[in-house]
Amino acid sequence: MNYTTQMDAAKKGIVTKEMEIVAKKENMDVKDLMELISKGKVAIPANKNHKSLDPEGIGQGLRTKINVNLGISKDCYNIDMELEKVQKAIDMKAEAIMDLSCFGKTEEFRKRLIDMSPAIIGTVPIYDAVGFYDKELKDITSEEFLKVAEKHAENGADFLTIHVGMNRKTAATFKKNPRRMNIVSRGGSLLYAWMELNNKENPFYERFDELLDICEKYDVTLSLGDACRPGCIEDSTDASQIEELIALGELTKRAWERNVQVIIEGPGHMTLDEIETNMKIEKKLCHGAPFYVLGPIVTDIAPGYDHITSAIGGAIAATHGADFLCYVTPAEHLRLPNLDDMKEGIIASKIAAHAADLAKGVKGARDLDNAMAKARRDLDWERMFELSIDEEKARRYREESKAKSKDSCTMCGKMCAVRNMNRVTEGKDLNMLRDDD
């Protein structure tokens, strides 16, 4: 190959096979896509070692993508169950899967995940460090942290979430500006703790050029984590969050100089009125890099329903610039999600993403809704099911209701507006009282 990364190829005017696939999916000219990649406005996470990957683009002008989190924990160490979740995510066409395993030796699961998955795979190397070395966090060296990141890249992870912006300056800002919920990012809290316990700079910030060496070698996209994302609505858009975002913007430019693709991770918990502003701030400070948000979750009082609170926030965020939504399940803040929780989270995120694509005017987004409108006017139930985000549920609800007429449902029966308008415009009687049709 005459290039090292997708960004390097784009800058050189080389069209890669990944670009061709993404351009076709997005119904856009591949040269336009290449231009966006060269400027960092779009990323195609595509590790050279992820052979089963069906690439997707994330960023400006493209369909909003969703990510599914899964992985092994100490309380739920069940590789087979997590692999079932992987298959569920693939079957439901999630564009990305993150392995957030945080206990024991995780490489076996990670390698199986990457081998079987056509979806983009992301990981968080710091979660793996304690188990990888069987060491307490404070005893892990900066060099060892980098080695774990390289192992994940070697395994085939398409993007690595690294909380590089939690440096000493950001930490000092956090200390001066107390929060109601402190730091709620798992990776961010681990790095902050390591820095405090060792009185040292963030190893990934201090050795950022070495991290870029790894990303360039394997064509790994760097997902710059938001250690200071707000964990409750009271902490949103505060000094720590903005200080870190400024640092991420500076790191983004350094990565691009090395032809390493970047995604910026974002909030978090915030009220509806702050979402648009946050999207604009990120795009400004981080130079238009793709934005990957968790939610945002728009109220703190709905445990068991946070797939809804996050879908509300996600739809608004993606309408105003977010490019990539991390799903949230009903189990958020309560437990590790099961398969049913996963499905609910994926559906909610897909609804949010599609609603935003409609609002943004993404090419082809309205085609599905227009097709559904036609199917409904035609009372073509089979076509309605096929077009549904959750075909199984739509079909089951219809079958369980046992409607007396094929033209209507149990809500309106023969008073169905669609049925009656069809009949009267065709010159037919409504037959409201007879059961024969």
Swiss-Prot record:
It is an enzyme of class 4 (lyase). Keywords: 4Fe-4S, Iron, Iron-sulfur, Lyase, Metal-binding, S-adenosyl-L-methionine, Thiamine biosynthesis, Zinc. [4Fe-4S] cluster binds at residues 409, 412, 416. Binds 1 [4Fe-4S] cluster per subunit. The cluster is coordinated with 3 cysteines and an exchangeable S-adenosyl-L-methionine. Pathway: Cofactor biosynthesis; thiamine diphosphate biosynthesis. Pfam families: ThiC_Rad_SAM. This is Phosphomethylpyrimidine synthase. It comes from Clostridium botulinum (strain 657 / Type Ba4).
